[in-house]
Amino acid sequence: MKGYWIRMGAFAVLIASVIGGYSLYGAPAPDSLETRRLSQFDQAIITNARQLVDDGRQIFRFDTFGDESFWGDALQLHQAIKGAKLGGVGPGLSPTAALGLGLKVDVDLLPSDLANQVRAGKVDLDDPATTVALLKLKAVVGLTGFFDNAGDLQSIGIQCALCHSTVDDSLAPGIGRRLDGWANRDLNVGAITALAPDLSSVASLLGVDQETVRQVLNSWGPGKFDASLLMDGKAFRPDGKSAATLLPPAFGLAGVNLHTWTGWGSVTYWNAFVANLEMHGKGTFFDPRLNDPTQFPIAAAAGFGNVRNDPDLITSKLGALHFYQLAIPAPRPPRASFDPQAAAQGEAIFAGKAQCARCHVPPLFTEPGWNLHTADEIGVDDFQANRSPDKRYRTAPLKGIWTHQKGGFYHDGRFLTLADVVEHYNNFFGLGLGTQEINDLVEYLKSL
């Protein structure tokens, strides 16, 4: 009987705890008022996250941050797109020419009948008027046209998606569904900018003439951009090659601290930097490091270290933009794109003999924390590193590397293949990797 009453007493305590709203372990009971309140707050978090993703996607794809005042009003780029026949200048930019420069078209923004006509080859892709029509549909990835009531193209602006989105070519080469976060290694930013009739604002900033600016822009080539040019004015490397660097992807950044090849700052820092100083939007930006007239003479003279615009069209959007970028996963490679058996062998080499994982720490495949190294530590020259505040190179995340093999590897594409990258480290660190081990390691990298 004594055991019976002990058991009944324990049962009574259990009932009382549930009625009172707490389990025996001190946590709220499943149906307690406190749990319901927590659930409501959890739901608010989920709702907020969804809203941030939706807002961030819209900003990433379509927000110019007011930069049409630069690309349209100052550079008059829209005039070169229209061409003389439509009231602009020059021959105009046809869809064929635009696609040749790496611009992409979002098939989901094309009316179904137009998409069918494109598929059937019934759309004139050699007429700049077709490009203007695509701009009216907001179908040109990363470009927004501004039209008057008569439908005349009056200005143009750019978005994040211009450089950091591509398409899946599902309708035709360069025409398909968006792939946000992918580096557009086809995009010739320099050649597109060089089309602008009036580059006087850039020439004045750099202290050169417009023809020199065009020569610099045309030296970049596809998939490259020089984000430091308007900071230090260094257009070419000491060896005479362009100082432009490869466009990096904007996916797989959750958990990654520093962004860009040389780690200027966090992802959201770089968003503010680019929106204000590269896209030339209208916002607020503060970085006193840019006040250094020795390292950043152009930026210091232009006051880029403390930018204030009223109204501010950027700052309120940085949170959602950041959240959306962190939500973009690194895409998984197609199964047929690598050898699974070799990749499995390569994984062991990555973590073991090659010691790749010391810096490219899984699952981030970069270092948690301050993920920067000096040029001497990785066996390359320091030209590009010295153009950044910390004068170092970032340990680049490796997930999704299969998506941006075009243009080469490292910040400037100096290594044409992944095998070249591995061979560089093999020689520099004296790893002693054989040919088969290098091949296996490459297959593993392609599998990430």
Model-derived regions: residue spans:
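Periplasmic c-type cytochrome electron-transfer domains
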Residues: 2-14, 18-448
